Amino acid sequence: MALFSKILIFYVIGVNISFVIIWFISHEKTHIRLLSAFLVGITWPMSLPVALLFSLF
């Protein structure tokens, strides 16, 4: 398995985990929850830690 494939699998797993986390953290309407979970999911290396910090306050 090439390095690119391993990185891609790691990224997809991170997308799925962050999508689920943000889906349960947000308390908006369903379509807004879906949009926010999707956007945080695809940019999870930078935005997931920020979203988790904001959810603490």
Swiss-Prot record:
Localization, UniProt: Cell inner membrane
Keywords in alphabetical order: Cell inner membrane, Cell membrane, Membrane, Toxin-antitoxin system, Transmembrane, Transmembrane helix
Transmembrane segments annotated in the record for this chain: 7-27, 37-57
Keyword Hydrolase: no
Membrane topology note: Multi-pass membrane protein
Induction: Expression controlled by its antitoxin GhoS, which digests ghoT transcripts in a sequence-specific manner. Post-transcriptionally regulated by MqsR which acts on the ghoST transcript selectively, degrading the ghoS segment while leaving ghoT intact; conditions which induce MqsR (e.g. overexpression, nalidixic acid, azolocillin or H(2)O(2)) decrease ghoS expression and thus increase ghoT transcripts.
Keyword Cell membrane (UniProt): yes
Cellular component, GO, one term: membrane
UniProt-listed Pfam families: Toxin_GhoT_OrtT (PF10753)
Phenotype of gene-disrupted mutants: No visible effect in the absence of stress. Reduces MqsR-mediated persistence (overexpression of MqsR increases persister cell formation). Decreased biofilm formation after 8 hours at 30 and 37 degrees Celsius, biofilm production has risen by 24 hours. Slight decrease in swimming motility. Cells grown in 20 ug/ml ampicillin in the absence of ghoT and which overexpress MqsR elongate, suggesting MqsR inhibits cell elongation via ghoT.
Principal place of residence: membrane
Cysteines paired by S-S bonds: none
Role according to the record: Toxic component of a type V toxin-antitoxin (TA) system. Causes membrane damage when induced by MqsR, slowing cell growth and increasing the formation of dormant persister cells; involved with GhoS, its antitoxin, in reducing cell growth during antibacterial stress. Overexpression causes cell lysis, forming ghost cells; both effects are neutralized by expression of GhoS. Overexpression in the presence of ampicillin increases persister cell formation (persister cells exhibit antibiotic tolerance without genetic change).
Family assignment from sequence similarity: Belongs to the GhoT/OrtT toxin family.
UniProt-recorded name of the protein: Toxin GhoT
Species of origin: Escherichia coli (strain K12)
